[in-house]
Amino acid sequence: MRESLKKLLHIEDTPERTALAFSIGIFLGFSPFLGLHTLAGLAVAFLFKLNRVAILLGVWSNTPWWLVPFYTFATWLGMWVIRFRIDWATLERMFQLGKEKGFLTSEFWMQIASQWGLLASFLTGSLILALLLSLIAYPLSLN
């Protein structure tokens, strides 16, 4: 049983492969694809036969405490990169709609979707920061 578990989890990988799995997990955990991080991590781990524990530790390093500050900064970075501007009145209107109608309503998300630049900024900034964090994580986890 113990040997089967080791094979399933790929615990006995080389340090380089374990560090790679962790850094891929970091990338996926901080990617903009909210709600799919764990599934994506497991899919990548099984597809490339990587250390499942290391990849999940990387994915789960983006805790709820980090979500708002990270994605706020990522969106700001994306806005700077793609040169997108949005006025505060529009942001306030969207936030007010979310508070009144609910952040999970189709009306709120239709308003968000109408601001394509905001979504593009979110995606761009999140991918840049996720890549940067994963590149930092590899050498740190290797040592």
Please provide the spans of the model-predicted regions.
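Hydrophobic alpha-helical transmembrane segments
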Residues: 3-11, 63-82
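Small-residue-enriched transmembrane helix starts and helix-helix packing motifs
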Residues: 4-28
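Hydrophobic alpha-helical transmembrane segments of integral membrane proteins
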Residues: 14-18, 22, 34, 38, ...
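Hydrophobic residues within alpha-helical transmembrane segments
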Residues: 23-24, 57-61, 124, 128
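Transmembrane helix boundary and interhelical junction motifs in multipass membrane proteins
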Residues: 31-44, 48-74
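Juxtamembrane non-transmembrane "cap" segments at the membrane-aqueous interface
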Residues: 75-105
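Membrane-interfacial helix-loop-helix junctions in multi-pass membrane proteins
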Residues: 101-121
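Transmembrane alpha-helical segments in integral membrane proteins
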Residues: 120-143
